[in-house]
């Protein structure tokens, strides 16, 4: 996000093999400038020339050894024949080719394309190259590239003169099943889908090509597959993680399809006597599904026929006469290309902001809702509340607050002036937690006391991994992540920074509602909220304000000391401040700019790169917002002075 540019396909189709009732051709085309998709194109061969367009089927393969070139060998083939998984030796030894051949014989144009790092697609590796912090901060990953390749494979299929664009289907197994339902969730062109032995409530995908940051936080593959509704989709299961698909997954999918009155257009069948597979038994289930929903007119039941396979060496796309293009990028070149691409996209957003902020807020704001978990609240509950009097005047309350649907409790403290709640709330967060607002005797620090005496309520909390939510009360400097690929961690779990921002939003929203009712008696609108972040909490607070503002000026000032922090300084995958995608959207300043035109004082910026501050200045200038950027740190006394001076 935003989408990558889709340039000319420039497809090369060569070396036609005629098998009598179908043909096979070799294909490569440009997915991105300097990155190529390779594969085999299967076409039905008509008895006589026809102008009739045929259904097109896209077939991604999974993690079979050598992918499109897969040869099970004689021993495994014999085992498959013995177990009844296959009827013919050719299908048992070359099950991927068997699928393409049968679909072509049924009247479909079939494109069987390579995953990155398999068969002819060897310019980039499959399981490495995107695990470093730089890739994480820019959301560069193999999942994104392969999904884009699938979109481009659809572009290629649609470009063929003999393909009916209204009858496009996708089917693949295992990792190819992942590519199938991911593509079908994102692209509206496929009309039929059959992801085999992948969709389940269990394991969600074990390869880096099936995972990326933020992909499955709070959801699973059932949810993603449901995005295809109400178009026809069928699933197959086996004696693997998909074994329960008929009872765990299918009922939920039928419920979603039922919203459209189309529960009959989703189905699943498990064959528990077979291990992980896309064997003839499962393939014939798929053939029937395609026959019915692509309106192929075949006589049921459809049985796969024997065929003459092409030896893997003869499937190779690149040869002496058709060498790999000279501009094919290496991994290092691709990474540079990708970085320049996203930098160019962001620069275009900044440049366009001179004419208005609508597009900037649409693109970066949409990203921020994912990165910063800025979803609307659905309610709150408080518990363990204790009350008492403050030395020097006023009262305190302590307790925990829980956001509906999240479960974890956030410890908080609310200090109220002697005369009761006033028209504004100071929500002050610190890296040490709420304890930072009190001295060693448990009294409010002088800055907090001045705010109370001036009629401001003061709120603080121990957000994620701070204060009471740590083992020893000390700041957490390292968090556990997967050793080589954080997509396995942050694809399912929110980063600590995002948790902290969401906790800030939860606490502020809950008490803004509570105090607004207390001050206004339920009438006259909400109170003003000043947000303060010190002691390492400045980044959490300014990004929380970015989520809260939504293009509107807040009724309070935001004072955030970032302590020299910038996302470009992060070097470790276990850094609790690591936010995947941050540098793709302008870093600290690019995301914080969403707070405009709310009044913002950003301190502790000494050492923060210009590249992460200039977007903030640019957007605030266009929004005509009040922005003050200070190199030095912001003291507690300065916080009180700035709030009381307004």
Regions found by a protein language model. Give the residues of each.
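Catalytic-domain carbohydrate-binding cleft regions of carbohydrate-active enzymes
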Residues: 171-176, 180-196, 202-210, 214, ...
